[in-house]
Amino acid sequence: ELAPIVLFVYNRPEHTRACLEYLERNELAAESELYVFADGAKSGSEEAVAAVRRVIAEPWKFKRLNVVERPENKGLAANVIAGVTSVLETHDRVIVLEDDLIVSPYFLRFMNEVLEVYKDTEEVCHVTCHMLDHKGELPDTFLIRWCNSWGWGTWSRAWQYFEPDGRKSLREIERRGLCWEFDLDGGFHFTQMLRDQIESRNNSWFIRWYASLFLRDKLMLGTGRSLVDNAGFDGSGTHCNTMQLCTQTLSMNPIAVVPISPVKENLLARKVYSRTYRYNYSYRHKLKVFIGNLWIRVFNRKKR
């Protein structure tokens, strides 16, 4: 049995259409059950939300389409937590996407193979095939003590570890002196992100999920090439019209799933992730992207 796909959508009809079109091109799409959780409208977003719901009501080519239209706006975090929890009450595994993601034709094959191969491997609790552009060679698949929320999968056996109380997780991370490791060895301020969630400066489900698994020494299976691209940084609605802090190249070749032994973290992958995040969010790189986008806007004005 194939893993059900769970898609979270809100107010971006064109992103939603692109996500579904790319997903539909996968050879396993017609054999897969799709759950769509459509969040309710905030004031002023009614028209866009209605447009999204018209898109998902079209005749898509999946085995079965289950649509949950929220009557109120839950917000992404609450929608993801409730949606994943409900699907895992009747299935033992799940593949999760958000509306700004587009996937390779080999995405579903890879995710289903990994979810089957590692279904009884307790140390592995999270799966992704998204990878940022990076320097340095990585194997096709590897294990790392981290999480990636852009096109991921998990099992009901792992989701039971989810701790929604970020304060409890932060307290334990600090008590054990693990802030540096939690920050990907200084690569990104994930500890501060967790603090911000606690103080309601963000409402991230991801940071709480990452903390939940990190504190239990659980691993993610990741890939050296990306079968997922995040199209949500387009700004104006045209993906190629802006420079991005984080870039990824969508691979159009399959990734073989070979069981990794021994089951332990790949330290090279950890180093590459840390270095990539440190560079992408450095002031130097941010300035470069800012200037690049400024020039793009000036050039576009001149063309008009």
Task: Identify the role of each PLM range.
Residues E1-V96, L101-R304:
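An acidic/histidine-cluster motif and surrounding catalytic segment
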